Each structure stands twice: as structure tokens, then as C-alpha cells.
Amino acid sequence: MAQEGQNIDEPVVIGEEKGSVRLTTLNRPRQLNVISPEVVFKLAEYLELWEKDDQTKLILIKGTGRAFSAGGDLKVFYHGQESKDSCLEVVYRMYWLCYHIHTYKKTQVSLVNGISMGGGAALMVPMKFSVVTEKTVFATPEASFGFHTDCGFSYIHSRLPGHLGEFLALTGARLNGKELVAIGMATHFVPSGKLMDLEARLVSLDSGDADVVQSTIEEFSEKVNLDKDSILNKQSVINECFSKESVKQIIQAFEAEASKDGNEWITPVIKGLKRSSPTGLKIVLQSIREGRKQTLSDCLKKEFRLTLNILRKTISPDMYEGIRALTIDKDNSPKWNPATLDEVDDEKINSVFKLFEDDDIELQIPETEENRWGGKYETSGYASVRG
């Protein structure tokens, strides 16, 4: 079935061999390069092929149009809700792919000149080199529509300075390219006007040596200076508020800070928090907090369980209601269930974090070199059950 607005003859991911360089282009510009099942499948196919290929030295990834990638294809989730576990395969494949991106054996460079959100940013942040521009916009807005911070971001956000991770995950606050470099979520800032020249230089390198690639990028990169009103200059307030034990306490502390001179920026952030799914907020906070003590593998396995429970409406249908309000009916008036933080049962929140009874249906992370590309969906407990 052709994707909406996509020419049936156009591949959603373009893989090109240019000497020893492999260039991957996300090619759904009308949909802001959102990650469809086919995108996940092709990316995994290319990355495995190229890691095993002795002729491949360097991997580049970019997006067509004004976005790098706006994240997962929410409409696929929404329209699959009436068929049990219809999205299970793509979810499994995506988290399995995230592990391999984080642990990839060859040098990868992401060229991010536009929107990079949610799962789309999972193709940016873990790379050896992530190049951003003045057009780059990053966010993890999942809590706003009843989902959770996934695709490895419970691992990434939990390792940011102070309690910035909780802030980004709960509020969906946006960061620009300079801010991403400042906190280590990107490695280099290059003006967008120089990006094509940088790409051409990287393609001509014939080297995957990290030092050579880094020095080449630095020929084009600029030192970053944060804007005066950058959210990163509010770190002390963020740490004070987002270190609180619960979402309710975080909001209360934030409201107290909002009344102080110079903190006018807080009011719209609070409004956004209060519009978000109460269930989603509680899941997100617990996931980030647990992530601080978990390995990458543990975080991805946990996120897989959370996603399946959310897709199955185990404790709430909020994700589907959030997607409806955001992208289907576009009324921006979701009716959350439960409607308030006080009504959300913490025991139910804990239940969606629990291990599955059968280890065969956990995400299978290949943690030994001998099994480096094992654990695929095809060999999982799900494939045998679903046929």
C-alpha cells in the first residue's frame, strides 16, 4: 500500500554507495520523513549489510526536505488499534534497530538540517558525529499525546546534566542546534549553507577513521554561543523543580517559581504540562528515573514493554486519544482517561513496567559479538505465535 502523499515509485529510504561511503537518505518529505514500518525495515537492512561489508568505511544519514525526521508515523498506530498487536512487529524492529545504531561498529555521521523529534532523533543523537544547523529543531513530545519517551531516550535523557532530562521528556520543550551541541546531544554546529559542501567532502574522504572525519567536520563547524534566553540558562530552576519526587510536586514547584521576576517563561510550559496526558506524564517520569540506573539494553527492553502495554490500552487509551486530537481530528482537545494526576493509580503505572511472564516475548538484545545481528523479529517468540 502506498503511503499517503508518497509517489509509489519513490523509495522511502534511499541507500547509495559512493566509493567507501554509504549515504542513507530518509525520503518522505511530505510527511516530514516520519518513520514508517518500511523505513525501519530498510534502515536495519542497510546498516547490517554495511557493517559486514569490508568496502564500507563511513555511513552518512540525512533527510529530504525541511525535516530530518519528525519521529514515528502516529497514524499507523492510530489506524491499527482495532487489530490486536498490529504494530508489534514495527515496534520490535525499531527498538532492535536503536540498539544497533547505538553500538554500530563503523563511523556514522548524521546531517540534521531541520526537524528531529522523538524516534527520528534516535537516528541522530547516538551517532559518532551528529551535525546540526540553525534550522535544527529537537523535541521529545510523547507525553503530550499519552505516549512515553522511547527509542532509547529514557537512556539518553537520564544522562543529561542535572534534571534536564526530566524537563525535556515531560514538557516536550524544543532545543535548537546550538543547544544540542552545548549538552552533548550533537557534536558539531555547521551553518546550513555549508552543509552540502561538508557532505561532498565527507563523501570524497575514502576514510572512516574517526579522527579524520572529525577534523573534516571541524573545517566547516562553528563554536556555539547560547542565546541569552536559552532554556539551558535556566538549569538551576529546572533542577530545583524537576528533581521533585512526583509529577504533581514538579508542577507545584514550577508554579511557585513562575511567580518570581524573570520567570515568565515558565507559565506557558506549565500550561503545556497541564494539557498533557496525566498517565503519560507519570509513565515518562518513572521511565527517566529508572533509566539512570539502567543499561542501554535494559532501557530499550523496558521501553518495548511500555509501548506494547500502551498500544494494548492496558491501563489507559490515552495514546489513541492524543493522536486523534493531534493528527486525526486536529481539535487539540483530548479527553484523557483518567483526567487528572490524582485519579491515575500508581499501582497501575507500576504494572506496565513489569517484566513479561515469558522471557521469549521480551525484546531480544544481542549482547555478544557472536550473536551481533541476532535477536531479529523473525526469530522472536512473537513471530512464531503470529506466523
Curated annotation (Swiss-Prot):
Q: Which residues form a coiled coil?
A: none
Pfam families for this protein: ECH_2 (PF16113)
What NCBIfam families does the database record attribute to this sequence?
PRK05617.1 (NF004127)
Residues bearing the modification N-acetylalanine: A2
What's an example GO cellular component term for this entry?
cytosol
Give GO terms: molecular function aspect only: 3-hydroxyisobutyryl-CoA hydrolase activity
Q: Which UniProt keywords apply?
A: Acetylation, Hydrolase
Full protein name: 3-hydroxyisobutyryl-CoA hydrolase-like protein 5
Which Enzyme Commission number(s) are on file for it? Answer: 3.1.2.-
Species lineage = Eukaryota, Viridiplantae, Streptophyta, Embryophyta, Tracheophyta
Q: What class of enzyme is it?
A: hydrolase
The lineage's top-level taxon is Eukaryota
Annotated InterPro entries = ClpP/crotonase-like_dom_sf, ECH_dom, HIBYL-CoA-H
Q: Does the keyword Hydrolase apply?
A: yes
Q: Which family does it belong to?
A: Belongs to the enoyl-CoA hydratase/isomerase family.
The species is Arabidopsis thaliana (Mouse-ear cress)
Q: Does the keyword Hydrolase apply?
A: yes
CDD domains, per this entry? crotonase-like (cd06558)
